[in-house]
Regions:
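A short helix-to-beta-strand connector/capping loop
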Residues: 21-26, 153-159
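Conserved GTPase G-domain signal focused on the G5
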Residues: 161-183
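Glycine-rich phosphate-binding loop used to anchor ATP phosphates in small-molecule kinases
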Residues: 27-32, 57
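Switch I (effector-binding) loop of TRAFAC-class P-loop GTPase G-domains
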Residues: 1-27, 40
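Conserved C-terminal guanine-recognition region of P-loop GTPase G domains, centered on the G4
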Residues: 47-49, 54-153
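Extended hydrophobic secondary-structure segments that form protein cores and membrane-embedded regions
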Residues: 30-32, 106-112, 159-165
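Short acidic, Gly/Ser-rich segments with clustered Asp/Glu that frequently serve as metal-coordination loops
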Residues: 33-40
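Alpha-helical scaffolding within the catalytic cores
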Residues: 41-45
Length: 183
């Protein structure tokens, strides 16, 4: 339609991950939509229309630097509210009916820029916990914990991971974990 933002087409990507000398290769289909407020309803419509199995919600450390910066948290709560209530902003009757049954198999909260908020920090405890499950207790996730609990109570499993896309830290491992956990 003229004057409306058109969603980008989904793209296919190959994910390679080596585990104990065994290389696993999976093909995934992904779409990246903008993070501005006026795109939020489009996120939800896109998830339902494409029947997305894994939702990866990417955050960074902005809310730790500036406590008044709550844009990420508002976007997160918007998505969580819709997933828990199954109330999606669909346009057609058919899509509204489809949305009542929609639920993702996995919700992944991924904290990006770990090279900035974790590895450059003076807190040696968290640097030691980089490759452990204890990193899930880091304060970067604190504002998002109530929403993750709501998802869990609604029957939507979720995981928390830390990556640095710029440096390539744990990106493949995180995608592989998502693919493994959704089963």
């Amino acid at each position: 339609k003229k004057g409306q933002y058109q969603k980008p087409d989904a793209t296919l990507k190959k994910v390679r991950y080596a585990i104990n000398e065994r290389v696993t290769v999976r093909t995934i289909q992904s779409t990246d939509l903008g993070g501005q407020v006026h795109y939020w309803p489009m996120w939800l419509r896109d998830m339902v229309e494409r029947d997305v199995e894994i939702v990866i919600f990417l955050i960074d450390h902005r809310h730790m630097i500036d406590k008044t910066n709550v844009e990420q948290l508002e976007a997160f709560n918007y998505v969580v509210d819709a997933l828990v209530s199954r109330n999606y902003p669909m346009n057609s009757r058919r899509d509204k009916k489809k949305s009542k049954q929609y639920s993702p198999r996995l919700f992944a909260l991924v904290a990006n820029k770990a090279d900035m908020w974790l590895l450059n920090s003076d807190d040696k405890i968290w640097i030691e916990r980089w490759k452990t499950d204890q990193l899930n207790q880091h304060q970067i996730y604190d504002p998002f914990r109530p929403g993750l609990d709501r998802l869990r109570r609604a029957g939507i499993p979720n995981i928390k991971r830390s990556i640095s896309a710029l440096r390539g830290y744990d990106v493949e491992e995180t995608i592989y974990d998502c693919l493994r956990h959704k089963v």
